């Protein structure tokens, strides 16, 4: 993947000084706020279509990834799908026979519902499907119930990453959340539930990796010693 990225940049006429992997960048963004130094972190990168769990150790200016686990077919889209199917079930309709346009409406409303819940106690879905006015109201507790199967799929990579790193959760100094799905309070609460450790919440999941990459570039520009090990 790194070789392909370098080749793509070269073909585009972009000079690549160095690549920094995403977990290391997230750890740097965290350290920029909390202080540079030694530490061991769990990086939960939960985007629209993939989940990656990384255990990153920072020691003597070296960022080393101790273990990686994940699910390449799990992301925010799975929450959308679960909400969409629940909407149809509660309104007594079958999702599968719906026209592509109607399906698109239901999925769009499901995503809007998911996005709005972090900032308000309840979210409502209203759609005109097949000439009928359909509606559904969700709160965060119901969202957890509706998406329980999705949440359970999150637990396995978390446990595998810890197992492969030969560390326990007590060895983890902090849990860093990145990716749009980590903005959901229900995701943060579930990570805390399965680890027993409250994740860091003062890092922006949407921009943490970009910030970390910028910090890495700044450190390299000053010729400071920093190594990034895969």
Predicted regions and their residues:
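Oxyanion-binding/catalytic loops of NTP- or PPi-dependent enzymes
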Residues: 1-230
């Amino acid at each position: 993947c790194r070789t392909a990225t370098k080749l793509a940049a070269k073909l585009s006429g972009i000079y690549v000084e160095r690549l920094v992997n995403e977990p290391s960048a997230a750890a740097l963004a965290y350290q920029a706020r909390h202080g540079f130094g030694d530490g061991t972190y769990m990086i939960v990168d939960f985007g629209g279509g993939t989940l990656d769990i990384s255990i990153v150790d920072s020691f003597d200016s070296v960022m080393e990834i101790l273990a990686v686990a994940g699910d390449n077919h799990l992301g925010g889209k799975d929450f959308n799908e679960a909400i969409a199917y629940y909407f149809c079930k509660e309104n007594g309709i079958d999702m599968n026979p719906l026209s592509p346009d109607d399906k698109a409406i239901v999925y769009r409303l499901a995503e809007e519902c998911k996005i709005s819940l972090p900032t308000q106690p309840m979210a409502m879905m209203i759609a005109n499907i097949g000439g009928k006015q359909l509606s559904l109201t969700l709160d965060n507790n119901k969202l957890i119930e509706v998406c329980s199967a999705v949440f359970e799929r999150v637990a396995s990579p978390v446990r595998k990453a810890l197992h492969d790193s030969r560390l326990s959760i007590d060895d983890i100094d902090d849990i860093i959340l990145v990716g749009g799905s980590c903005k959901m309070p229900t995701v943060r609460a579930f990570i805390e539930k399965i680890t027993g450790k409250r994740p860091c919440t003062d890092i922006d999941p949407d921009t943490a990796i970009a910030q970390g990459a910028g910090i890495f570039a700044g450190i390299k520009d000053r010729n400071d010693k920093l190594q990034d090990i895969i």
